[in-house]
Amino acid sequence: MVHYNFLSLIIFACFFAVFVLLVRAQDQSGFVSIDCGIPEDSSYNDETTDIKYVSDAAFVESGTIHSIDPEFQTSSLEKQFQNVRSFPEGNRNCYDVKPPQGKGFKYLIRTRFMYGNYDNLGKAPDFDLYLGFNIWDSVTIDNATTIVTKEIIHTLRSDHVHVCLVDKNRGTPFLSALEIRLLKSNTYETPYDSLILFKRWDLGGLGALPVRYKDDVFDRIWIPLRFPKYTIFNASLTIDSNNNEGFQPARFVMNTATSPEDLSQDIIFSWEPKDPTWKYFVYMHFAEVVELPSNETREFKVLLNEKEINMSSFSPRYLYTDTLFVQNPVSGPKLEFRLQQTPRSTLPPIINAIETYRVNEFLQSPTDQQDVDAIMRIKSKYGVKKSWLGDPCAPVKYPWKDINCSYVDNESPRIISVNLSSSGLTGEIDAAFSNLTLLHILDLSNNSLTGKIPDFLGNLHNLTELNLEGNKLSGAIPVKLLERSNKKLILLRIDGNPDLCVSASCQISDEKTKKNVYIIPLVASVVGVLGLVLAIALFLLYKKRHRRGGSGGVRAGPLDTTKRYYKYSEVVKVTNNFERVLGQGGFGKVYHGVLNDDQVAVKILSESSAQGYKEFRAEVELLLRVHHKNLTALIGYCHEGKKMALIYEFMANGTLGDYLSGEKSYVLSWEERLQISLDAAQGLEYLHNGCKPPIVQRDVKPANILINEKLQAKIADFGLSRSVALDGNNQDTTAVAGTIGYLDPEYHLTQKLSEKSDIYSFGVVLLEVVSGQPVIARSRTTAENIHITDRVDLMLSTGDIRGIVDPKLGERFDAGSAWKITEVAMACASSSSKNRPTMSHVVAELKESVSRARAGGGSGASSVTDPAMTNFDSGMFPQAR
């Protein structure tokens, strides 16, 4: 009886376990499945997976829907590929999906594409894919039947998933399907928010089709892969993968494994990344599918580029899944993972499945949340039809239509301009506009807005232009707004509002009723307040005079960078009649000054200057609109006839050129050199990517990189700077300007300016920073002048980084970062602009090198390789050796 009850209990437990697994396999509560291009409000359950797909109409506000060419609508084609939504209008079009679980969770996000000649043009497109405001990947379609899948694992920082398609003028972007799957929080744990799928293979898979849901509870797609001279093993019993660290690879995948036929061979997976700086995580899934006899052993080690990555050998467990993975991301020009048989093993290595992901580091900050909430409220209130989806200000090149933003350092972008003219707006001016506190320009003209002009518009202190023409506004103009207009602090346009009263009597009449109620207590209050104000004023006056009568020391604190105009007499006073010269350049002399107890640098235009007023004006106009911690701040300027001056923040430690030339006795350490280079690179990156249109500095050199008392570097001297076209097709063929040695040879030849001209110059500066040598030096053997790029190129062939690094550093430098920075510098200084990296890439490399130097990386010289020259991806291929 006891035996019978125990047997019944076992049977019940088995049935219950199977039931739980079936229920779990059917659970789609963490799924969002969208078929792009099917009619609005339609849905269906996929015949193969039973996943419910819905129309994309509720998740996107733009685009047109199409069916693919009937020629490609075969019975075997997944239903999601039979329709598409294309986006022929606008540079950026976004899907906005709100998963039920919201932010803080980890999701697998997948986009799928099949062209199918839906437009009958026979031209497969090429476009970019963004997740929110950061680039995810590029989508290249080879032909009508090519299926492209892009997958990313991402932890949400907001409640919304924004998937955006960006037009590159290489065909119309489109999308076939968008799928979002909730993952366990303990799955794919890394310090990074996003991992892009590189490869996911079912090794030794017996089927011809990929494995996915319901076999995989997370609906990962496993591609079967088999190799010649490899044995495939198939488990006779089911592999347990449910307790596998949360990964839970599909049981069908884990039931098969592959191993070399040659018992002495290893398994090798290797690939050469397109970019050697890309970082990868690799997850290898193992299960012994054959019960081994007692005299057989399967044991192996896992090596990366011939170095062990696990401290001990590994033996897969019979019918149980284990996952081995790297704790830290790996990178390099070539990555090779080897499963190496140990001496005591009688059997070769075995593997069931492998996943490889590339780290996607999101460098762009999202738009200020208050601004986002405000503009979304405005969109909802007025039903704005402008395809306002995704981040309003990011990416930098693709802000929302009719929105302009400011981009300062690493801070969140801010909305500074909103144009809603002729947008069919009705009702009153919404209070949400008051939360756009950095707004400079607001255009609400030619709508049907009613009611009064709200008082809060007068409190937007940054607002310099307000256009309310052509509406149905009524009542009086707010007093503050009228006062600001009278003081020419704001350009106020209100024509075309017949019921709007603009006379002074309106203001008096409007305020009279309010004031009469409070007039008696107000008079009594005013007397008391005036007395208090007078007392405070006298106290502050005393304090100010007392401070001035003290030591007279000059503060080293932060400056007030509010730009203002100064009279020439004030400039004379600031410089104490031009007492102390700090330096001299083509513009004129630079003098030391004191302004409001702060040190400043005052650049005076020489009347004999060859640069003159044009460069003066260019620098003033540029510095008035750009703000970044690595660009010198303009405090003010003077222009009285031929007398012109620029007042900057004071940079106590001179220029980078002073240190490299030996003019200063202090020798910059290796870490200080890297940090100064990073500072300068960040300043240039802001000019190139944070300004719209991009700005080219045109004269990047050590003398134009200033250093403050904290050894923080800032780019200076913008008199030669120019804006260039956003699309990169700049046709500026003005006279070539710059400094010999740093001047881009391609720009000098073609006279066509682009950001890559700055990158060339910065590469030369980097070589000077690394070597401590001048840009042009005379050869000891031929007595000819040799450029630093030629000298370094020659020394690279020796394979000894010590021959390149500044000898004043001795052995006090990190060889790994020295190699990296030298390679980056040489790539920047390539004679062809096409081979030069972007400043964003340079900044990323420098950040990594700074981190390495601070962590005390090894100082030994590495072998001579040039990862920057690796420009292909050979895929990831297993080999038996």
Swiss-Prot record:
<feature type="glycosylation site" description="N-linked (GlcNAc...) asparagine">
    <location>
        <position position="419"/>
    </location>
</feature>
<feature type="binding site">
    <location>
        <begin position="582"/>
        <end position="590"/>
    </location>
    <ligand>
        <name>ATP</name>
    </ligand>
</feature>
<keyword id="KW-0433">Leucine-rich repeat</keyword>
<dbReference type="GO" id="GO:0004674">
    <property type="term" value="F:protein serine/threonine kinase activity"/>
</dbReference>
<feature type="binding site">
    <location>
        <position position="603"/>
    </location>
    <ligand>
        <name>ATP</name>
    </ligand>
</feature>
<keyword id="KW-1133">Transmembrane helix</keyword>
<feature type="modified residue" description="Phosphothreonine">
    <location>
        <position position="734"/>
    </location>
</feature>
<dbReference type="GO" id="GO:0005524">
    <property type="term" value="F:ATP binding"/>
</dbReference>
<keyword id="KW-0723">Serine/threonine-protein kinase</keyword>
<dbReference type="InterPro" id="IPR024788">
    <property type="entry name" value="Malectin-like_Carb-bd_dom"/>
</dbReference>
<dbReference type="InterPro" id="IPR032675">
    <property type="entry name" value="LRR_dom_sf"/>
</dbReference>
<dbReference type="InterPro" id="IPR017441">
    <property type="entry name" value="Protein_kinase_ATP_BS"/>
</dbReference>
<feature type="topological domain" description="Cytoplasmic">
    <location>
        <begin position="540"/>
        <end position="881"/>
    </location>
</feature>
<dbReference type="Pfam" id="PF12819">
    <property type="entry name" value="Malectin_like"/>
</dbReference>
<keyword id="KW-0472">Membrane</keyword>
<keyword id="KW-0808">Transferase</keyword>
<keyword id="KW-0675">Receptor</keyword>
<dbReference type="Pfam" id="PF07714">
    <property type="entry name" value="PK_Tyr_Ser-Thr"/>
</dbReference>
<feature type="glycosylation site" description="N-linked (GlcNAc...) asparagine">
    <location>
        <position position="435"/>
    </location>
</feature>
<dbReference type="GO" id="GO:0106310">
    <property type="term" value="F:protein serine kinase activity"/>
</dbReference>
<feature type="modified residue" description="Phosphothreonine">
    <location>
        <position position="739"/>
    </location>
</feature>
<keyword id="KW-0677">Repeat</keyword>
<keyword id="KW-0547">Nucleotide-binding</keyword>
<protein>
    <recommendedName>
        <fullName>Putative leucine-rich repeat receptor-like protein kinase At2g19210</fullName>
        <ecNumber>2.7.11.1</ecNumber>
    </recommendedName>
</protein>
<feature type="glycosylation site" description="N-linked (GlcNAc...) asparagine">
    <location>
        <position position="143"/>
    </location>
</feature>
<keyword id="KW-0418">Kinase</keyword>
<dbReference type="GO" id="GO:0005886">
    <property type="term" value="C:plasma membrane"/>
</dbReference>
<feature type="glycosylation site" description="N-linked (GlcNAc...) asparagine">
    <location>
        <position position="404"/>
    </location>
</feature>
<keyword id="KW-0597">Phosphoprotein</keyword>
<feature type="glycosylation site" description="N-linked (GlcNAc...) asparagine">
    <location>
        <position position="446"/>
    </location>
</feature>
<feature type="transmembrane region" description="Helical">
    <location>
        <begin position="519"/>
        <end position="539"/>
    </location>
</feature>
<feature type="glycosylation site" description="N-linked (GlcNAc...) asparagine">
    <location>
        <position position="462"/>
    </location>
</feature>
<feature type="topological domain" description="Extracellular">
    <location>
        <begin position="26"/>
        <end position="518"/>
    </location>
</feature>
<dbReference type="InterPro" id="IPR001611">
    <property type="entry name" value="Leu-rich_rpt"/>
</dbReference>
<feature type="modified residue" description="Phosphotyrosine">
    <location>
        <position position="747"/>
    </location>
</feature>
<feature type="region of interest" description="Disordered">
    <location>
        <begin position="851"/>
        <end position="881"/>
    </location>
</feature>
<dbReference type="InterPro" id="IPR011009">
    <property type="entry name" value="Kinase-like_dom_sf"/>
</dbReference>
<feature type="repeat" description="LRR 2">
    <location>
        <begin position="462"/>
        <end position="483"/>
    </location>
</feature>
<comment type="similarity">
    <text>Belongs to the protein kinase superfamily. Ser/Thr protein kinase family.</text>
</comment>
<feature type="glycosylation site" description="N-linked (GlcNAc...) asparagine">
    <location>
        <position position="234"/>
    </location>
</feature>
<keyword id="KW-0812">Transmembrane</keyword>
<feature type="signal peptide">
    <location>
        <begin position="1"/>
        <end position="25"/>
    </location>
</feature>
